[in-house]
Curated annotation (Swiss-Prot):
InterPro entries: Ser/Thr_Dehydratase, Ser/Thr_deHydtase_PyrdxlP-BS, Thr_deHydtase_catblc, TrpB-like_PALP, TrpB-like_PALP_sf
GO biological process terms, semicolon-separated: isoleucine biosynthetic process; L-serine catabolic process; L-threonine catabolic process to propionate
Regulation of this protein's activity per its record: Each protein molecule can bind up to four molecules of AMP, which act as an allosteric activator to the enzyme.
Known pathway: Amino-acid degradation; L-threonine degradation via propanoate pathway; propanoate from L-threonine: step 1/4
GN (gene name): tdcB
Keyword Nucleotide-binding carried by entry: yes
Cofactors that this protein relies on: pyridoxal 5'-phosphate
Entry-annotated residues carrying N6-(pyridoxal phosphate)lysine: 64
Subunit composition and interactions: In the native structure, TdcB is in a dimeric form, whereas in the TdcB-AMP complex, it exists in a tetrameric form (dimer of dimers).
The species this protein was found in: Staphylococcus aureus (strain USA300)
Designated name of the protein: L-threonine dehydratase catabolic TdcB
Lyase in keyword set: yes
Keywords, comma-separated and alphabetical: Allosteric enzyme, Lyase, Nucleotide-binding, Pyridoxal phosphate
Alphabetized CDD domains for the sequence: Thr-dehyd
Length: 346
């Protein structure tokens, strides 16, 4: 079965047409993020041409703003009038809050009681009402669903939604605009909305593009589902890639991923830290753990070199919302192992 046939099979979930419509819908809101070449990853590590897609420079510091703005922009006037609600402790919260502010919609964000103060304040700064409820995300989500039902508010899901996936897929269109002959694209994965959208965009134009998902060894529900060919949960511990800390992937995103993604790479916590440090040190890029996953996969040597050598490769830096205390810890840890670390990016 060809990939073109498969993209038709998954079109009922999200299609190239949906992504092209999203591109027009969110153009007034988003920033077209830069694509820069990493000379070190290209010349010294892969012998290919490796480019970094900098979604850490997106408004709110994350790709999540794309999907949130597309979803909210497609709501009916009645839905907008009743307000929107989301459960999130991170990037999705800020994407929803900023979009609501720009469109003049009331937004409520329910966060776990343990949500970092910095993220609470950032979300409030965009004008959203923040409610702290629940000792874990599941409790937070359940409370959010109760509030939505009681008040008739529309839930904005962080990944398992057609419009959200389409919004994230606009990154794929930008990649093709910049490098029409791209061969390999490496994407961080949590719930799967990002890679589902990007894979749909890329494979619709060129089925031979090799798409690699990257997850932490500690949390990789989508990778587990992909290889077992069944929706599966996986979480053995927390991860520094907290933006991808999703135990069970989305049902819709999984359906797209299982058809359009080619493989998954799992990286260790230490490999993620190394990538964060190297991106800061050599490329002057501040990234959160999730945003460093693709670079970690390249530096780890776990990707078959046939997808890298003499190839045009894009590694997505998905976001840069990282606490300064975590940045400090990564730098300190990096200095402690400097004698044995050889990876640099630039």
């Amino acid at each position: 079965m060809t990939t073109n046939t498969v993209t038709l099979q998954t079109a009922h979930i999200v299609s190239l047409g949906d992504i092209e419509e999203a591109k027009a819908s969110i153009k007034p809101f988003i920033r077209r993020t830069p694509l820069i070449k990493s000379m070190y990853l290209s010349q010294s590590i892969t012998k290919g041409n490796v480019f970094l897609k900098l979604e850490n420079m997106q408004f709110t510091g994350s790709f999540k703003f794309r999907g949130a703005s597309n979803k909210i922009n497609h709501l009916t006037d009645e839905q907008k009038e009743k307000g929107i609600i989301a459960a999130s402790a991170g990037n999705h919260a800020q994407g929803v809050a900023l979009t609501a502010k720009l469109l003049g919609i009331d937004a409520t964000i329910v966060m776990p009681e343990t949500a970092p103060q910095a993220k609470q304040q950032a979300t409030k700064g965009y004008g959203a009402k923040v409610i702290l409820k629940g000792k874990n995300f599941n409790e937070t989500r359940l409370y959010m669903e109760e509030l939505a039902k009681e008040n008739g508010m529309t839930i904005v899901h962080p990944y398992d939604d057609k419009f959200v996936m389409a919004g994230q897929g606009t990154i794929g269109l930008e990649i093709l605009d910049d490098i029409w002959n791209v061969n390999t694209v490496i994407v961080p994965v949590g719930g799967g909305g990002l890679i589902a959208g990007i894979a749909t965009a890329l494979k619709s134009f060129n089925p031979s593009i090799h798409i690699i998902g990257v997850q932490s060894e500690n949390v990789h529900g989508m990778a587990e589902s992909f290889y077992k060919r069944d929706l599966t949960e996986h979480r053995v511990d927390s991860t520094i890639a907290d933006g991808c800390d999703v135990k069970v992937p989305g049902e819709q995103t999984y359906e797209v991923v299982k058809h359009l993604v080619d493989e998954f790479i799992l990286v260790t916590e230490e490999e993620i830290e190394h990538a964060m440090k190297d991106l800061m040190q050599r490329a002057k890029i501040i990234t959160e753990g999730a945003g460093a996953l693709p670079t970690a996969a390249i530096l780890s040597g776990k990707i078959n070199n046939k997808w890298l050598e003499d190839k045009n490769v894009v590694a997505l830096v998905s976001g840069g919302n990282v606490d300064l205390t975590r940045v400090s810890g990564v730098i300190e840890h990096g200095l402690n192992i400097a004698d044995t670390s050889k990876g640099v990016v630039g």
